[in-house]
Curated annotation (Swiss-Prot):
Residues 404-488 form the KH-like domain. This is GTPase Der. GTP 2 binds at residues 233-240, 280-284, 345-348. SUPFAM superfamilies: P-loop containing nucleoside triphosphate hydrolases. Associates with the 50S ribosomal subunit. Pfam families: KH_dom-like (PF14714), MMR_HSR1 (PF01926). CDD domains: EngA1, EngA2. Residues 30-199, 227-403 form the EngA-type G domain. Belongs to the TRAFAC class TrmE-Era-EngA-EngB-Septin-like GTPase superfamily. EngA (Der) GTPase family. InterPro entries: G_ENGA (IPR031166), GTP-bd (IPR006073), GTPase_Der (IPR016484), KH_dom-like (IPR032859), KH_dom-like_a/b (IPR015946), P-loop_NTPase (IPR027417), Small_GTP-bd (IPR005225).
């Protein structure tokens, strides 16, 4: 059982979100990675430098399972780099999952431009020495700039306090407090110094020279992308495998262990001249299973990912079908008004398939949750990359359709015609009448209808109108909200 969660992020000035320049073709934005053994405060430092709680922080070893990354851009200080939080590198006797985690972390080290090696003021272990030896010996790492930071130094440290670290052969160490934000400005200055000759420097200066500089707190950059796509679903439905299939390499840790992904992972992708930000979320669990603080944070982050997304892929496990909790996910997507489509993963594992198998699957699905009748659905295999490209084509199509705007005159004409077709068939009272309607948003497709009697518009009539709107304006997968208001004075 995890210990009680610590409130590790000190209150600071509000994050100012600004538009970061899109990188020029062929230009590389430098990468800075935080490394160290488990439980030295890597995720806390990551969050503190970003000034937002993106990584899960918990006084419990091994919380970070994936490499998290976020771009830090601050024009007036000539800062532009990707900051990465890596898993602890001191896993003993790793199983297959842990081995994959380690391989991902070590690959990240080799791809980094600057490394921040984090140590704990209160304890130096054999694992620290082992990691230090690796950094010194590994060919693809040894020549990289390394900043040695001693964390949890909440009070001033003199040379005597740091003597044990100097005995490790470190010529210079920087005492910091990730929680208290002590010396983080100095750490950023050191990072900036080592990045001076790295790729991207010329590009940063070129952009800076053309823009007016304004004093701002360190911002979290907003990337130049078309839309944000989130992948959600039950644990072990194959979300990380799908992310990897889309990216074309192992961006997230993949395992058959449910809930491998604890953090939400953002990946910026380019398809031709189109860009999207892809988010792989922690598996949503029933609330009763999120008692531990770690699972609670993962659940909350998944909800937040849905709220901040423009489009969602709801991933199902072909063998497990559409369960009660999948219904909760779909209801949540409807409630939040998010355009979404269904991807039935692991379709290759279904045996004895015929031409009717998919049709029968959809009929069974629609009988359990009729609202899914108007949602695009596709079968895929993430591990075999089966129909993954078609899934992305559907996603781009849905993104384009989610901005559908209809003129007020056309809406009024069509809705009044449909109301005339309905007549009294949907109401035992006088015929329901619509006097006027207007569209107030595109995603969800939200209409306000001024009517004679709100109570005359029963659920069956509302469903009829939604169906006509979906068919007429190609709104499959886009939630429709009809808000009825009485026009009576």
């Amino acid at each position: 059982m995890a210990k009680a969660v610590k409130k590790e992020i000190a209150k600071s000035e509000e994050v100012v979100s600004i538009k970061a320049p899109r990188k020029e073709p062929g230009k590389k934005i430098p990468v800075v990675s935080i490394v160290g053994r488990q439980n030295v405060g890597k995720s806390t430092l990551f969050n503190s430098l970003l000034k937002k709680k993106l990584a899960i922080t918990e006084d419990y070893p091994g919380v970070t399972r994936d490499v998290l990354s976020a771009r830090i851009y601050q024009e007036e200080k000539d800062l532009d780099f990707y900051l990465c939080d890596t898993p602890g590198l001191d896993i003993e006797n790793p199983d297959s999952l842990s081995q994959t985690i380690l391989e991902t972390a070590y690959r990240q080290l080799r791809e980094s431009d600057v490394i921040v090696f984090l140590l704990d003021k209160n304890l130096i272990t054999t694992a620290d020495h082992g990691l230090l030896n690796y950094l010194r010996r590994e060919d693809k790492v040894a020549n990289k700039p390394i900043i040695y930071c001693v964390n949890k130094a909440d009070k001033e440290l003199d040379e005597f306090d740091l003597e044990e670290f100097y005995r490790m052969g470190l010529s210079e160490v920087l005492p910091i407090s990730a929680i208290g934000r002590k010396n983080l400005g100095l750490l950023l200055e050191k990072i900036q110094f080592f990045l001076k000759d790295k790729p991207g420097k010329v590009w940063i200066e070129k952009i800076s020279a053309s823009k007016k500089k304004e004093a701002q707190p360190l911002p979290l950059a907003e990337e130049d992308y078309e839309f944000r796509l989130a992948i959600v679903g039950k644990p072990n439905s194959g979300k990380s495998s799908l992310l990897n299939a889309i990216c074309g390499y192992e961006r997230a840790v993949v395992s058959d262990v449910a809930g491998t992904t604890r953090d939400s992972i953002d990946t910026l992708l380019e398809f031709g001249d189109r860009r999207l930000l892809l988010t792989d979320t922690a598996g949503i669990r029933k609330q009763s299973k999120t008692a531990e603080a770690l699972e609670f944070y993962s659940y909350q982050r998944t909800i937040k990912a849905i709220e901040s997304s423009d489009l969602v892929i709801h991933l199902l496990d072909a063998k497990k079908g559409f369960g009660d909790f999948d219904k909760k996910i779909t209801s949540l997507l409807q409630e939040k008004g998010k355009p979404f489509l269904l991807a039935v993963n692991k379709w290759d594992s279904i045996e004895d398939k015929t031409d009717k198998t998919f049709k029968e699957y959809k009929e069974k699905l629609y009988s359990r949750f009729p609202l899914l009748n108007e949602v695009p659905i596709i079968t895929i295999s993430a591990t075999e990359r089966l129909r993954v490209q078609k899934l992305m084509d559907l996603s781009f199509d849905l993104a384009s359709r989610s901005h559908r705007k209809v003129s007020t005159s056309e809406l009024n004409k069509n809705l009044k015609n449909w109301m005339g077709l309905a007549g009294r068939s949907f109401s035992a009272h006088q015929p329901p009448k619509m006097l006027y309607c207007t569209q107030v948003s595109t995603s969800p497709f939200h209409l306000i209808l001024f009517v004679n009697h709100v109570e005359y518009f029963k659920s069956n009539l509302v469903s009829f109108l939604k169906k006509k709107l979906t068919e007429t304006y190609d709104l499959q997968g886009i939630p429709i909200r009809l808000e009825f208001r009485s026009d009576r004075k």
